Amino acid sequence: MPTVNILSYFAFSVEAVLFPMSSELWEKGYREALGYGVEKICLYSFVLVLPIAILMA
């Protein structure tokens, strides 16, 4: 499905940034910063992807 391909493009972009950052913060012991960062990234991803998904539906 074309919609899934477009939405997965955004998911892979976030994943490419989130995974290395999260493992580095976890190893350095910055768990509070990690939680804050993951929360913000999820929020902004949702805010960006939801309108696109609604327009495509």
Curated annotation (Swiss-Prot):
Give GO cellular component annotations, separated by semicolons. Answer: plasma membrane
Per UniProt, the keywords (alphabetical) are: Cell membrane, Membrane, Transmembrane, Transmembrane helix
Q: How does it sit in the membrane?
A: Multi-pass membrane protein
Which subcellular locations apply to this protein? Answer: Cell membrane
Membrane spanning segments where? Answer: 4-26, 33-55
Identification of the protein by name: Uncharacterized protein MJ1621
